[in-house]
């Protein structure tokens, strides 16, 4: 069941991924949302799993977001243009690195395109971030995603992160 108005119920697109389709009423734009729920819960809310969502409009990626399902702490660094960011540690398969993701109203983080491209081709994806009850890790199993479907809907292909 989808939480968004005018969006069809999700269908499996391989592994633990779901795809939700809709049409924007005013513009007629085709919207596709891919969602991956984490394998675990955060301490603050044992009923809501953290999730990753990819939003695509008319065949292009518009936003990749990480929603932890808990209220985020204040931003801890400025971005390139001064927007507030939260630094997280990301693990994609056997590579890990720190990223500053844009902090969106204290509810979710906007991921960079490089991380999204690494995620869609990965078997292991983990995000460690500060929460109000200490550092926590969201663990995902992204393997099995139909990459042809993501390429059609978002013009996105996987890319392994560099180890340097």
Residue ranges and their predicted role:
Residues 1-164:
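A generic "folded-domain core" signal
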